[in-house]
Each structure stands twice: as structure tokens, then as C-alpha cells.
Amino acid sequence: MIYQNREEFKNANMFGEGAPNDGYARYFTGNSYLNPLVAPGQAPLFLANVTFEPGCRNNWHIHHAEKGGGQMLICTAGEGWYQEEGKEPVSLHEGSFVYIPAEVKHWHGAKADSWFSHISLEVPGEDCRNEWLEPVTDEVYGRL
């Protein structure tokens, strides 16, 4: 469901908007918010609800790992996009699930006309690290 009104979206976003995602703001076009569901190191998996304002998206990035690793997204509210390099974008909505293996260049974010949130799970592995790359240009995003 498309949410243009922030208050309506907040009511639908069952895992909460969280705080401005200032620590990662340089890797996003637009404003995002982060609500950790477990504290880092508290559980074997780090889980957080990430919220994107309309038009917000993260840069292209890769989750590297020597073994295992990657990322999973569980879409919780609103509508967004996911795209792997060289592939067509995938429309996301509440209930969508995306598994992103390690070493896959990709990006994800909100549609231009809707707030969007997903739970992000970092898949355990060996020597896991993220490589943040170039922004998704307005030209590329505008064609969606």
C-alpha cells in the first residue's frame, strides 16, 4: 500500500520508525530512520527496521563475506524497490521478502510516492563487511 502521509504510515509501521539514521546518512539519497530491534552483539543476528521517506534510497552496495554472509529484507510497510546490478528492479510491498547473497551489488529504497520500511537482517558469515559504492542517480531512479 502506498503511504504518502507520514502519520498514516507511522500507524501502519508496526516496528516503529526509530531515530534519524545519521550514522549512515552519507550512503543514502534522502532521509532514512533506523530502529534496532536487538542491540548489536545481543543476539546472533542484528535486526533493524529501516524506514525510508518517499524517494529515499541507499547507494549501491555489496555485502562481502569469505563464507556465508549477505542480507535479508522483510518488507513491513509501504512500497519500495530492490535492484541487483544488471537486473530489472523488483517492486516491494508489505510482506515481500528478499534474500541477497554475499557479493551481489544492489540497492533498495522507497518508491518516489510512498514511505517504505523493511527489517534488515545481516546474515552471519566469516569476514563479513559492507562496501558502500556510488549513489543511485536521479536519472536511473526516475526511470522506475
List where the protein language model places each region.
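Short, conserved beta-strand element in jelly-roll/cupin
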Residues: N49-E53, H64-Y82, L121-P124
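Short beta-strand His + acidic residue motifs that chelate non-heme Fe in jelly-roll/DSBH
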Residues: N59-H61, Y82-Q83, I100, K105-A112
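Short hydrophobic/aromatic-rich beta-strand segments that constitute the beta-sheet cores
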Residues: L34-N35, Y82, H118
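A short hydrophobic beta-strand segment most commonly corresponding to one strand
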Residues: M72, Y99, D113-W132
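Short acidic-glycine-tyrosine-enriched beta hairpin
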Residues: G86-E103
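A short, N-terminal "cap"/entry segment at the start of jelly-roll beta-barrel domains
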Residues: M1-F46, R129-L144
